[in-house]
């Protein structure tokens, strides 16, 4: 059911690979079969937990929490939505913003971090209904409008 989508942190828009990339994917899988399925681990559990702790330790100021709240409130005010932004989505946006800040080596979460990740966090949560009359045709266009109308700290 669509409300279950709220449990996913991000929505990733994937397209089909081009011909050359698809061929490489097939070759990788063919080689993997030849090696009896021995898969190389990219990261172990301890390293993953350590990285998660570092991401959660990235500071989020009260001002950034207000900005995230303002974005969520702006999304909730849209009329004609089938589904909108929950409290869980606000937490997801904060955590994803911390991850972006960590990956960008920022000392704290900045508005640019939030703006960079709000699309993947909101896109599967904002479902436009048939009666939606917001002048946009997709959730990604709506997110752009929400970003434009929300004051940046």
Predicted segments with their positions:
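C-terminal engagement/docking regions of AAA+ P-loop ATPases
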Residues: 77-153
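Amphipathic, well-packed alpha-helical segments that form the structural scaffold of globular domains
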Residues: 69-73, 119
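Conserved AAA+ ATPase core "coupling" helix
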Residues: 1-58, 62-70
């Amino acid at each position: 059911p669509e409300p279950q989508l709220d449990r996913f942190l991000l929505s990733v828009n994937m397209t089909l690979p081009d011909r050359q990339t698809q061929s490489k994917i097939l070759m990788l899988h063919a080689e993997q079969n030849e090696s009896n399925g021995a898969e190389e681990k990219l990261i172990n559990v301890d390293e993953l937990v350590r990285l998660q702790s570092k991401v959660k330790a990235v500071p989020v100021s009260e001002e950034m929490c207000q900005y995230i709240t303002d974005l969520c409130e702006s999304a909730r005010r849209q009329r004609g939505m089938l589904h909108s932004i929950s409290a869980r989505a606000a937490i997801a946006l904060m955590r994803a913003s911390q991850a972006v800040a960590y990956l960008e080596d920022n000392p704290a979460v900045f508005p640019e971090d939030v703006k960079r990740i709000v699309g993947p966090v909101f896109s599967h949560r904002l479902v436009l209904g048939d009666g939606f009359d917001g002048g946009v045709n997709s959730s990604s266009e709506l997110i752009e409008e929400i970003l434009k109308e929300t004051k940046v700290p």
